């Protein structure tokens, strides 16, 4: 018998009590001082202004904020403390994060606090991340088939298992071991990707390739996109035509889009369908605060207004351009990013004027062959480290959901 089995048998032989989260914790919605620009400050005594863009990909903790607000702004916002939980009520819907800093949250967040007499922080994190709770939040927040913003009442109504602290601690120990293994593999993969970036930059060195420096504008035809009316169901329901938005551009090669539109949208909303083999970049999104997203699209697609898409001209390999834009991406982002504005964006005219090395087509193809093979090793979920990480993650999710499922203890009323 495992230690967990022993603890369950000893401490809760008749099952585990379930309680509504609102009965054992404080759940509140964030608040935004408006207009927010008035309260943003660079002063050292400013209060952390926590946004979704401050969250590292895959992170459990929020450790810093890019912006601060004045104390006056903080009085009009929701103050949260180190150790509290926050949940996104829109982007990264329902995803829990543990605060490692004090600060303020806007109305796109919910906070959970005053739970430590009942829950270990790490146990509550695993519990809120579990498939059952995530599905329950999505179900409760859905109305008429459209996902609504997650609100405090929905989160308060979540019914959660409350085992003894000793049981929570053992579950955390087991799941921490799973996540530690995954983290080690992920770190090794990150090191390989760093190595890949180094070799990519060496291969794309203009001197090594005897390449000409060519303005991005001269690589082919650049175009933008738009969004068909969301109010027209016929533009979206059962759509089969890919529609690229910034949330799709996360991998070097796009496998599919989250949203799809219909032929009616193409015809009536004058959407342009771009050919397979196009290259897309994001020019307007919060992700531009730290990343320049580029992707190669191996299928016909449409795009929204935050995307610019390139159809390369004869003599230019679109795969080569994709690799080159990724290699020079940080420099492009830094030199073309607009200052100010409510949403991060690039000055596209400056992007078009940026120069990248373009060698003869046969050299482009040789470079692509080398980089495609290296990229496959780094990102293909069917081989090597990516496959092992994927398998570990599935194993972790399986045991997490299994360990967090308890027989419910129901108090019997005596006659």
How should each PLM-predicted stretch be described?
Residues 1-11, 402, 414-415:
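Accessory (non-catalytic) regions of SAM-dependent nucleic-acid methyltransferases
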Residues 1, 15-19, 124, 156-193, ...:
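Amphipathic alpha-helical segments
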Residues 10, 73-74, 144, 230, ...:
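Short, solvent-exposed loop/turn positions at domain surfaces
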Residues 85-88, 136-139, 161-164, 289-290, ...:
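Long compositionally biased, domain-poor regions of proteins
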Residues 89, 104-110, 143-163, 301-308, ...:
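A short glycine-rich beta-alpha junction/loop motif
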Residues 51-52, 64-129, 245, 262, ...:
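A short beta-sheet element
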Residues 24-37, 53-82, 218-232, 247-276:
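Sequence-specific dsDNA recognition surfaces
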Residues 8-32, 202, 206-227, 388, ...:
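Non-catalytic DNA-recognition/assembly elements of restriction-modification systems
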């Amino acid at each position: 018998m495992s230690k967990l089995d022993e603890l369950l048998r000893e401490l809760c032989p008749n099952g585990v009590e379930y309680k509504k989260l609102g009965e054992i914790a404080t759940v509140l919605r964030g608040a935004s001082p408006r207009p927010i620009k008035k309260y943003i400050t660079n002063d050292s005594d400013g209060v952390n202004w926590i946004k979704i863009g401050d969250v590292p990909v895959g992170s459990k903790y929020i450790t810093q904020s890019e912006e601060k607000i004045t104390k006056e702004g903080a009085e009009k916002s929701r103050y949260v403390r180190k150790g509290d939980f926050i949940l996104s009520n829109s982007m990264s819907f329902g995803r829990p994060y543990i605060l490692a800093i004090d600060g303020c949250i806007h109305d796109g967040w919910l906070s959970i606090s005053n739970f430590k007499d009942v829950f270990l922080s790490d146990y509550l994190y695993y519990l809120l991340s579990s498939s059952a709770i995530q599905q329950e939040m999505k179900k409760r927040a859905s109305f008429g088939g459209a996902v609504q913003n997650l609100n405090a009442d929905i989160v308060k109504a979540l019914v959660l298992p409350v085992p003894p602290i000793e049981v929570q601690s053992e579950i955390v120990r087991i799941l921490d071991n799973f996540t530690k293994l995954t983290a080690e593999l992920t770190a090794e993969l990150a090191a390989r990707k760093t190595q890949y970036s180094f070799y990519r930059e060496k291969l794309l060195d203009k001197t090594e390739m005897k390449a000409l420096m060519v303005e991005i504008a001269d690589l082919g035809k650049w175009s933008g996109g738009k969004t068909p009316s969301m109010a027209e169901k016929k533009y979206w329901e059962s759509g089969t035509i890919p529609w690229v938005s910034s949330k799709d551009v996360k991998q070097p090669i796009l496998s599919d889009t989250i949203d799809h539109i219909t032929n009616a949208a193409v015809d009536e909303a004058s959407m342009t369908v771009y050919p397979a083999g196009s290259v897309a970049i994001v020019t307007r999104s919060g992700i531009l605060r730290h990343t320049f997203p580029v992707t190669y699209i191996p299928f016909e697609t449409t795009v929204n207004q935050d995307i610019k898409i390139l159809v390369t001209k004869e003599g230019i390999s679109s795969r080569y351009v994709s690799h080159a834009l990724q290699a020079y991406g940080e420099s492009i982002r830094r030199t073309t990013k607009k200052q100010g504005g409510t949403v991060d964006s690039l000055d596209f005219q400056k992007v078009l004027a940026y120069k990248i090395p373009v060698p003869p087509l046969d050299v482009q193809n040789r470079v692509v062959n080398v980089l495609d093979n290296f990229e496959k090793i780094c990102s293909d979920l069917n081989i090597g480290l990516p496959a092992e990480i994927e398998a570990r993650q599935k194993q972790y999710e399986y045991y997490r959901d299994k360990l967090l499922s308890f027989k419910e203890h129901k108090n019997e009323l005596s006659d």
